[in-house]
Amino acid sequence: MLAEALASHLESPLGRGHVPEDACTGAAGGAACGDLVRISLALDPGSPEGRIADAGFDASGCGAAMAAGSATVGLLRGATILEAARIGADEIAQELGGLIPSKRHAAELASDALHRALGSAARTRARLAMVGGRTIVAMSGGVDSA
């Protein structure tokens, strides 16, 4: 029997097929299981803390992958980049009311896709935050042998 939360995400997926304007997208999946989850998110440009303004997903494969994408979008609503970075497979599985071990990979795929989208968003935000054309570069490493 499906958990009520999982069934709800399957019946009415949140943000399925929606790609926000100026979206940063991350995808995860593979040939091993045939599942693919793509998470897209857009940042609020007026938000100093990097609040997520909109999110959507697309998924193919098993129903658990679809539900995990939907649950991820639900968890992203109103979150900042930092809060979203704390969302992992455990939080996604919990949002679905738990997943059996053979379906846990769906939450892991959604988490991986989310973190790839967040990486893209962080890079975009860093480019937008450049002030005065100055760039500071920090380097570490050994002594130049030349």
Show the residue positions of the predicted features:
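Short, thiol/selenol-centered motifs that function as redox-active sites or metal-ligating centers
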Residues: C33, A59-A68, A106, A110
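C-terminal binding/interaction regions
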Residues: M1-P20, T25-G26, A53, A79-E83, ...
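ATP-dependent adenylation/nucleotidyltransferase module used to activate substrates
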Residues: L128-A146
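Short Gly/Pro-enriched turn/cap motifs at secondary-structure boundaries
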Residues: A27-A32
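Alpha-helical support elements that line or immediately flank enzyme active sites
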Residues: A64-A79
